Amino acid sequence: MITRRGVLKFIGGVMATGAALGAYAFVIEPGFLLRTKHYAFAPPRWTPGLKLRLVLLADPHLAEPHMPLSRWQKIIATANDLGGDLTLLLGDYAAGHSWRTGSVPVAATAKAAAAIEAPLGVYSINGNHDWWDDRNAQRKGDGPVLAERAMADNGILTLANRAIRLTKDGQAFWLSGTDSMAAIVKGRGRFESRADINAALAAVTDDAPVIHMAHEPDLFMHIPERVSLTVSGHTHGGQLRLFGYSPVVPSAYGNRLAYGHIVEDGRNLVVSGGLGCSILPVRFGVPPEITVIDLG
């Protein structure tokens, strides 16, 4: 029999559950959790015997209280313990939402990144928020943006539509990168790209495998088969993700490119879940992550 006391207990239970879920999604998962996500595979056109470990740090969106400088420094210390040959910074260092109690200057973000240890180097690309956060770049319609200059001041090269040739154990490979596809704000929901995959790959002069850094995974649809692997961030895995589905994904392709290891037409893409938040400081089902990829 339904009683008033029973109804009140039920309502109280629902409210308590909602409060607990809200606290988890708005405080605990985005502000305190960190996982390491591992992938291991040999992509097409990969040199036999070439073993390479990539450590990806995507979308930190530094701002207090969820991603203060101290937390970024701890994440870097964790990344340094993962034994990466290369550490790749996939953009969006600037704050991604207005629900913050304090800002972190990009100069401080880059200075902390100088502590990253990787024998083959640390490389960066710009994210859309790095462009949006630079009023001068928006006015001129051109870079280099503040984040790129800050990284350069700390010895970190930004691969903005360019490529470099690297070697490990005498075996060569290329690392290329493109700028953001949503760099210049042209109006509500309208952006102008500064990504140029042709310019990035123009420097590739031999048949060594290519790893490409693209902030937005949508660029994957324009990546030629010549590229063995594309790595991206930007989506944060949708920030809300249940049973492999995210209701909102900042991609023209929705969940198709939201998160994880994606293989299409023999081409490989890994989309990191990233570290920070944008629009709202919320994460549920896709905690902040450091992404590790073992190739070969």
Cite the ranges covered by each PLM segment.
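Membrane-embedded segments
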Residues: 55-146, 154
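Active-site-proximal beta-strand elements of phosphoester/diester hydrolases
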Residues: 51-61, 172-182, 211-214, 268-274
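C-terminal segment of N-terminal export signals and the immediately downstream linker at the start
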Residues: 1, 19-55, 74-77
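Conserved beta-sheet core of the metallophosphoesterase superfamily
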Residues: 211, 216-291
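Binuclear metal-dependent hydrolase catalytic cores centered on His/Asp/Glu-rich metal-binding motifs
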Residues: 134-156, 168-210, 220, 283
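N-terminal secretory signal peptides and thylakoid transit peptides that target proteins
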Residues: 1-18
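Active-site neighborhood of phospho(di)ester-bond hydrolases with catalytic His/Asp-centered motifs
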Residues: 57-58, 87-92, 121-128, 159-161, ...
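Beta-strand-turn-beta hairpins that frame and shape the catalytic cleft
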Residues: 43-54, 156, 163-175, 263-268
